């Protein structure tokens, strides 16, 4: 089973406060605790304005890597921010996430192709998350087809 630690996310009020105040100790401690609890990956999501997102992701990723070798799961709604954060990671990890919604998949797949990076795939498209299994499977196969390209 793959376990992704999700407690380094700026949408969590205490983490948002730590990011705003540059409280490195809170970020390090959350990373250490999740790694010790057995997380396979540590999701890092800044949830800040796009103009400071990459530098904030770098700050957070650097702090996480000070206390653990657990691979990073780079998380942002912005494909450009995800791609920009990859070089900050000491080892391959995950991109969270790709789907058939928008063009994020077309930005991320070429960058992680032929690398050891992987991604979380969401079974949704521009119409949202389908109700039917058949439609979800169609999206799944669409994602897999893009991965082959």
Residue ranges and their predicted role:
Residues 30, 56-64, 81, 104-108, ...:
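A general structural detector for well-ordered alpha-helical segments in enzyme core domains, enriched
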Residues 38, 87-94, 113-119:
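Glycine-enriched alpha-helix->loop->beta-strand junction motifs that scaffold or abut catalytic
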Residues 43-49, 70-78, 93-103:
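Catalytic beta/alpha-barrel core
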Residues 35-70:
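Glycine-rich, proline-tolerant flexible connector loops at the mouths of alpha/beta enzymes
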Residues 34, 85:
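Conserved, mostly hydrophobic/aromatic
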